[in-house]
């Protein structure tokens, strides 16, 4: 129910959120109960996420990445700046494009491209034109992701079950995923729910130091509290 609710709400706010439906399941004619069917995060003909397809003429490509516990898939796994410089212990996997397009050269390009973004985010001039983080990352997407996950106390966000994607000609955007532990369903009690958590996680650690990002998030939160996140909604 948490995933169903928040995926649908995110779909009204963000450029992309996974499609989700309740469905009744029958197996060999025997009723199994009510389940939640969820779209996996990927780009394809029948997917809601539409990224520019790879081209055989260049190794540059659109891509989607997942930060999570290790998948064990050596073909999809990459090492980025945050892992070897910031001691980020989670694994980064490529979820798009598929293995058909993942040549060693293209995989290396994706790893380098995302590492360049992380390096710029952790540089001393990360909030100064022309090197500012917002030149590479979509402000609205990163603020909405922060607000939705903090609002629901979804403490997996930003270090587990975390997805980020980028069209080859676009900016980085976040995608919500996995609210199983949200809304007071965490594995241990939340002692101080009035405190923020996402600000300590890898990319948001630096974003939270930027006054412009904080002000944009405050403005966005106030707007959402008048609508989709209001007490009456």
PLM regions: where:
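Phosphate/dinucleotide-binding and metal-coordinating scaffold of catalytic cores
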Residues: 1-233
